[in-house]
Amino acid sequence: MNFLNFSILIFAYLLGSINSAIIVCYIFRLPSPRSVGSGNPGTTNVLRIGGKVPAAITLIFDILKGLVPVVIAKVLTGNDFITACTALYAILGHIFPIFFGFKGGKGVATLIGTLFGFSWILGLIFVITWLCVAIITRYSSLSALVATVIASFSVIFTSDLQVAAPFLIIAIIILVKHKGNIQRLISGQESKIGDKAKAKNDSN
């Protein structure tokens, strides 16, 4: 790996490590997303805590965290594998941020950015899948899980296995991070889109 590739990967991780949910909640003088609602510093929890405007800002920045480094990697290296690895590093930064004690979000919004940066078709597959599941079920977590699996595995049909591998790893990591959501979905205790935030409890 040359210096350029290494620098891009480090940049992707560091940019991913900037947790917009925590910063946005601080700026809007809202409770910390790590202490209320689901306890997850992500867009859905910010929506429950502060409403549409803070959530929209969080979503946009989280998407850009994935989009920007992937586009940079694509333009500067022209290497699909390095670009896919850049996507992985951006996700790792979001989920395990060095600036916030390695305790971050679940990576879904950042994944959207990486998918659009890698291939707009993959990004579109994710968004359409998410919207369809969300409209039918009103579960943000279920929508994210289904869209993540479908979009990530779709890479196999557009690239070789080596290039697809980083996205498959991303899918596995995001599924593991949603373990609690999966358990609550099974038990019927998962919050739906539009539910108000409550103080963090044992179920989160």
Swiss-Prot record:
Transmembrane segments: 8-28, 53-73, 81-101, 116-136, 155-175
Record has Translocase as a keyword: no
The keyword Ligase belongs to this UniProt entry's keyword annotation: no
EC number annotated for this UniProt entry: 2.3.1.275
Bilayer topology term: Multi-pass membrane protein
Key words, A-Z: Cell inner membrane, Cell membrane, Lipid biosynthesis, Lipid metabolism, Membrane, Phospholipid biosynthesis, Phospholipid metabolism, Transferase, Transmembrane, Transmembrane helix
Catalytic activity field: an acyl phosphate + sn-glycerol 3-phosphate = a 1-acyl-sn-glycero-3-phosphate + phosphate
Gene Ontology terms: cellular component: plasma membrane
Entry's family note: Belongs to the PlsY family.
Subunit description: Probably interacts with PlsX.
Role description: Catalyzes the transfer of an acyl group from acyl-phosphate (acyl-PO(4)) to glycerol-3-phosphate (G3P) to form lysophosphatidic acid (LPA). This enzyme utilizes acyl-phosphate as fatty acyl donor, but not acyl-CoA or acyl-ACP.
Matching PANTHER family: GLYCEROL-3-PHOSPHATE ACYLTRANSFERASE-RELATED, INNER MEMBRANE PROTEIN YGIH
Name recorded for this polypeptide: Glycerol-3-phosphate acyltransferase
Species this protein is from: Francisella tularensis subsp. holarctica (strain LVS)
